[in-house]
From Swiss-Prot:
Function of the protein: Catalyzes the synthesis of GMP from XMP.
GO molecular function terms noted in the UniProt entry: ATP binding; GMP synthase activity
Keyword Repeat: no
Active site per database record: C86 (nucleophile), H181, E183
InterPro entries named in the record: Class_I_gatase-like, GATASE, GMP_synth_C, GMP_synth_GATase, GMP_synthase, GMPS_ATP_PPase_dom, NAD/GMP_synthase, Rossmann-like_a/b/a_fold
UniProt pathway annotation: Purine metabolism; GMP biosynthesis; GMP from XMP (L-Gln route): step 1/1
Principal EC category: ligase
Name by which UniProt lists this protein: GMP synthase [glutamine-hydrolyzing]
Domain of life: Bacteria
Amino acid sequence: MTENIHKHRILILDFGSQYTQLVARRVRELGVYCELWAWDVTEAQIRDFNPSGIILSGGPESTTEENSPRAPQYVFEAGVPVFGVCYGMQTMAMQLGGHVEASNEREFGYAQVEVVNDSALVRGIEDALTADGKPLLDVWMSHGDKVTAIPSDFVTVASTESCPFAIMANEEKRFYGVQFHPEVTHTRQGMRMLERFVRDICQCEALWTPAKIIDDAVARIREQVGDDKVILGLSGGVDSSVTAMLLHRAIGKNLTCVFVDNGLLRLNEAEQVLDMFGDHFGLNIVHVPAEDRFLSALAGENDPEAKRKIIGRVFVEVFDEEALKLEDVKWLAQGTIYPDVIESAASATGKAHVIKSHHNVGGLPKEMKMGLVEPLKELFKDEVRKIGLELGLPYDMLYRHPFPGPGLGVRVLGEVKKEYCDLLRRADAIFIEELRKADLYDKVSQAFTVFLPVRSVGVMGDGRKYDWVVSLRAVETIDFMTAHWARLPYDFLGRVSNRIINEVNGISRVVYDISGKPPATIEWE
């Protein structure tokens, strides 16, 4: 019998902050399971979840507006600790009898708060001391409204000159509010505050660890599928690879992995996937060479969104054909991860704006003939990588830069042709190889090459040539929501450009993309 790793759990209610998923990831890093739900949950749902504690997230709205979100009243009646962050603190204050006002100026950025009263939340935690020995905390503020009066049964724990109630607490009820973001790294002691709340105040044990997550997932897979056969589309990406390894550990040869080579992969990627999973790990793999079929379907198409849909559609067609050749397969496995689940829920409630169609879920058959197995659906990406390491997958593969689901289909601008893909593959491989050699690969968040369907004149020897252009792209980001272009050294860029132009016959010019996000997206299409 495996240990119940969900026994202690934190419920995070989402009021719309860009940092809310980061709060959840921080709680998981502390070894405690948590889930992220929309703020408008019912009392019955909270009772059913049975949390050890509740966190109210930040959000972009103003509590002073009539129809702004509120925490369900049951949150304050459930008898469990509650931690309000930024907007979460403001709605807590307002709902429990305090007062919030719109501020004339938004407070955004670094601040130092002075701890003026003892509290279990920050006891013994400090970044510095005042002249008279009071603890100071370096924090990150991001708010427009501010609490101007706290509820009568609360005390002020910390304040700044412009924010008199930076931390408030009701120790008896174990209610806490902070007017800053403990989840971001700029709040230097933020993790210690979250740990204090989750581990000490809520008394949650650290049961959520990679080894225990694997044991739990294996047990659940076996319970779900029994002796049935399972099919999985293996792409070689992190999610499908870790899904394959978990299923292989749980059901062995009852798993069949279908690897569709769409001709839109990186240099030598197909061979690497087959070698690693087939030869090294001994998984049962069906290799489907389908380059011609994908490129034929993409012929003449220039629109990025249409290209995505075509690639998704053809993959499903090819995958379905292979599935029909297998006998008695009753389950389809997918590498769905927790952010996909959150995103789908947000889309269903109309609370998210789709910028690009999601690569992973673009074209599932509307009428599933098989049951669905999703062993990663509770996990964030960083957790997937950690359990991948525990399962024996190589670090370099798990921590590779992101690669889009449509592959080179969205890195060749406009119409996708085999000639363009072949040139791009080789140019991109040189860029990545040089980044690794210069010890720059892990210093940037994502780097890749884009093929531009324009010819540019070049000089080779005594002659002129009229060949294609590629752009190098490298960005630095924490969350991929915003990004800065990477300031790579000029001599490095010169070396990469020289190698590409000299070694890849057909490319005459290399440019470097210096666009940030926003306004540009990270991928070109």
